[in-house]
From Swiss-Prot:
Chain residue ranges for the region called Calmodulin-binding: 414-435
Subcellular location: Membrane
One Pfam family cited in the UniProt record for this chain: Mlo
Topological type in the membrane: Multi-pass membrane protein
Any one Gene Ontology molecular-function term assigned to this protein's record: calmodulin binding
Entry's transmembrane regions: 18-38, 63-83, 132-152, 252-272, 274-294, 336-356, 380-400
Gene Ontology biological process: defense response
Residue stretches of biased makeup (Polar residues): 477-487
Source organism phylogeny: Eukaryota, Viridiplantae, Streptophyta, Embryophyta, Tracheophyta
UniProt protein name: Protein MLO
Gene Ontology terms: cellular component: membrane
Chief location: membrane
Consequence of changing W423R: Diminishes binding to calmodulin and reduces susceptibility to powdery mildew fungus
Gene: MLO
Amino acid sequence: MSDKKGVPARELPETPSWAVAVVFAAMVLVSVLMEHGLHKLGHWFQHRHKKALWEALEKMKAELMLVGFISLLLIVTQDPIIAKICISEDAADVMWPCKRGTEGRKPSKYVDYCPEGKVALMSTGSLHQLHVFIFVLAVFHVTYSVITIALSRLKMRTWKKWETETTSLEYQFANDPARFRFTHQTSFVKRHLGLSSTPGIRWVVAFFRQFFRSVTKVDYLTLRAGFINAHLSQNSKFDFHKYIKRSMEDDFKVVVGISLPLWGVAILTLFLDINGVGTLIWISFIPLVILLCVGTKLEMIIMEMALEIQDRASVIKGAPVVEPSNKFFWFHRPDWVLFFIHLTLFQNAFQMAHFVWTVATPGLKKCYHTQIGLSIMKVVVGLALQFLCSYMTFPLYALVTQMGSNMKRSIFDEQTSKALTNWRNTAKEKKKVRDTDMLMAQMIGDATPSRGSSPMPSRGSSPVHLLHKGMGRSDDPQSAPTSPRTQQEARDMYPVVVAHPVHRLNPNDRRRSASSSALEADIPSADFSFSQG
């Protein structure tokens, strides 16, 4: 191997030891600083009781570890295995991503390894470039995920003041439950009437509304009242804003990861990267189309709930109340919206990573960026898409997805969730023990033979029962008072079911006994300790 000037490159035995030590120390220092920084960040999340963000950070570490495994696998297998795989020249001359150069195919390190008429599947140089692309993709995906949660939290800060107003006297007076109003005169219904009620124009209004005032104060307060009315008591002092933040942090755990279907999308994109097809051009606009459809659908859900209030009654008492339901979402599945947002973010990160990789890699810039204007447009669309998804669509999703039929687990804080989990686990253990005892008692009862089927002593003539009979006979001179220890030893020696006297219960006692048995799985009070320790 030689450099550009034709001078042979020095291998490791010809490299000064101080140079090797300096480079190695730099790599170790940077890696240790990164690991220490992630550890400190996780400790800060735990100290601030940000369990969802801590779990997202752990998932991010797992993704980076996966990328490390892929890199290690490529490094270990590129020379002895992959570069020595030979394919026919006909198979190697189809589906090229770039135009064929006039210089011909560059010689591979293992060009002499393959027989005549065959070439290497991938050269060591192309494997190294693929290695770099996978690393750049992981970095961009993690970076875009962090930007998404940061801009979403910044957007939701504007909703905090609306939540604070719900405790004021002005809000309670404006939402007096004894006040009658016409439905079409309420602010929420009035905002979504007019052109918004026309079937053909509603989608157009919803499309443009996601860019300008996607969530207003009246929308937030109305959806908040509908959620509390459906899942909590009507006069509850519930912090809806805090609940949305926890719910969004739980969804962030999904967004930050790269699932197997997303890896499949990346593989399919690379497979369709063929010269003349323009796959990377038209596929770069797919995330934008998906995101605009998602934002339009979320705005349509708010409109449909407003129109449902209008159709339900012409006069309402108190504030207008929406009814959460899964029927407003695609296929009655609110979680599908999160999947499309996740797909959009990953595909956008893939496009930006591919752009940076092709620009920074020698030899690829002329291949992928022959049209500078189109490349610049792709970058602008990608940045605008990231801002739109992070600052508008994702916060809108966090609010509107609460209008499903079921509330999310983030309705409880960390201490309450832990207490409920302990209660459930304890109840399961007690039920398992109770079922086991009943099964053992049934097995012992079934194992007791009948009177005429076995020469063994019957239940009434067992030594334990004979002992009880002997104790009850005062005229037997041989009988003596038996100590409790002797009775216990006899019971241990002959483990049979002892008949207990039957007590008849009146109806009141039966009801009391049934209620006490229903509460048999008692939970220790320590499980419901809400201390911050």
